[in-house]
Amino acid sequence: MQPEVEPVCFPAMGSPTMHRKAGALLMDLETPEEMQARSLGRPIKSSKQYLRQVIAEYEALDRELPCIRKFPTPPASQPLCLCMETLPEEDFTHLEVLQALEAQLPGAMESGRVSSIRFENMNVICGTAGRRNRWLIAVTDFQTRSRLLRSGLSPRGLAHQIVRHDDLLLGDYRLHLRRSLVRRRMLEALGAEPNEEA
């Protein structure tokens, strides 16, 4: 008797089982970098291109905005805080800013409509040079705030616009978030653990 020989059958190429097996074989051939790229949802072929793109984006942001104010938490709202931005070479004193306030609001401090005047050296805060400094003026009511927003201040006769400090802080915070996101993407692309900026 002749032994029975089982005929060789090839499953159809459209078989889901075959595709799963082929996928597993392809996965086994991937490098760890390619597997990480796949897990992060990036196309495998362009993982090096993606890394170059992220680094270029970070460098472009660095050139565009070399010194960004960092925030450990979102800034708290201060609706009654106003700000006058000045150039670094405009070396105003507190007395000059107070006199400019008094020109707009006679008896501003004595009447209690202005509670404080504070100087913020943005170049020291951001560790850079050439940024506009900020004079923060805290008022006690919305009527005074509206009046100063409309009129502005003119220390030494130089007209300066007054803006809401919250608007400036929100702009600073958005830049901080943008830079943090780009930095996180760069670290992930490099395979490093993203952590908080120092």
UniProtKB/Swiss-Prot annotation:
Domain of life from the UniProt record: Eukaryota
Pfam entry (one): DUF4732
PANTHER family, alphabetized: CHROMOSOME 19 C19ORF81 HOMOLOG, HYPOTHETICAL LOC292874
The name this protein goes by in its record: Putative uncharacterized protein C19orf81
Higher taxonomy: Eukaryota, Metazoa, Chordata, Craniata, Vertebrata
